[in-house]
């Protein structure tokens, strides 16, 4: 999941992660919105949630998925609400850290500060998912 305003950094991380996951028996889930999520769809998400009520969709995704991976998100990003749903259900939230000067890194850096698991190397995440 991630920002609707995807950076080149976010695009690269998503591409690298999707490439690592393509031969694993892991279902990739996303929400149909622009930005990072549309890149996940383009690269092969297996399940796509849709609708206009993002609070309801976020709850459905949190019920369905085992973990949440957030690549980017700005201040006030909907990914913060989604992360809250996962945390409320006792599920792990993984975040890609970013530069503190980048608005698109605010949500991930803040969530890491609040206890989300930082993704320092993508290969380590794929080990956790097996």
Regions of interest found by a model, annotated:
Residues 1-130:
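Glycine-biased, small-residue-rich flexible motifs in mid-sequence functional cores and linkers
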């Amino acid at each position: 999941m991630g920002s609707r305003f995807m950076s080149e950094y976010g695009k690269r991380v998503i591409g690298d992660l999707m490439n690592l996951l393509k031969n694993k028996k892991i279902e990739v889930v996303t929400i149909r919105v622009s930005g990072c999520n549309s890149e996940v769809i383009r690269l092969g998400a297996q399940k796509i949630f849709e609708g206009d009520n993002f609070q309801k969709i976020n709850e459905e995704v949190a019920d369905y998925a085992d973990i949440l991976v957030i690549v980017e998100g700005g201040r006030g990003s909907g990914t913060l609400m989604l992360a809250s749903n996962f945390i409320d259900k006792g599920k792990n939230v993984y975040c890609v850290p970013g530069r503190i000067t980048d608005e698109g890194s605010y949500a991930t850096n803040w969530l890491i500060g609040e206890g989300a698991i930082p993704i320092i190397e993508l290969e380590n995440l794929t080990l956790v998912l097996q």
